[in-house]
């Protein structure tokens, strides 16, 4: 926007995989495809979820929790969506948007060393698939 309006340089904006956040309590952050969108686009979709109470909530006595979900095209192993509800969701999804935009794979996430103790470490330690959707060949 700034380059186009103030720098007088037209910039083509890529509207795919733009992160979005809702600054409610708890925050909601999302980037990429939803499960439904991925299922419509890909033959096999894997979903990884983590629901937990972050350490800072535990230490402070807060009951707040975080839900994270990765949506993966199983055919390419590419992470095509990430959805987070909880503290710092906007900050987390902004960074994950880089990985989604770069077409990072679930294996890339798995190979990333986790920074402990953070909520973000859940994104690279989700090893157990929680759902797999296989499109009916007749559909």
Predicted segments with their positions:
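Flexible, glycine-rich terminal cap/loop adjacent to redox cofactors
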Residues: 3-11, 23-139
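Short linear capping/connector segments at secondary-structure termini
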Residues: 15-21
């Amino acid at each position: 926007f700034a380059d186009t309006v103030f720098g007088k340089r037209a910039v083509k904006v890529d509207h795919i995989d733009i992160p979005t956040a809702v600054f409610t309590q708890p925050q909601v952050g999302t980037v990429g495809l939803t499960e439904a969108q991925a299922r419509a686009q890909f033959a096999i979709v894997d979903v990884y979820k983590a629901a937990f109470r972050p350490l800072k909530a535990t230490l402070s006595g807060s009951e707040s929790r975080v839900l994270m979900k990765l949506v993966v095209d199983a055919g390419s192993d590419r992470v095509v969506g990430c959805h987070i509800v909880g503290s710092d969701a906007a900050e987390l999804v902004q960074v994950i948007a880089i990985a989604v935009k770069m077409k990072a794979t679930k294996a890339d996430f798995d190979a990333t060393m986790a920074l402990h103790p953070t909520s973000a470490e859940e994104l690279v330690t989700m090893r157990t698939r929680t759902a797999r959707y296989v499109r009916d060949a007749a559909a």
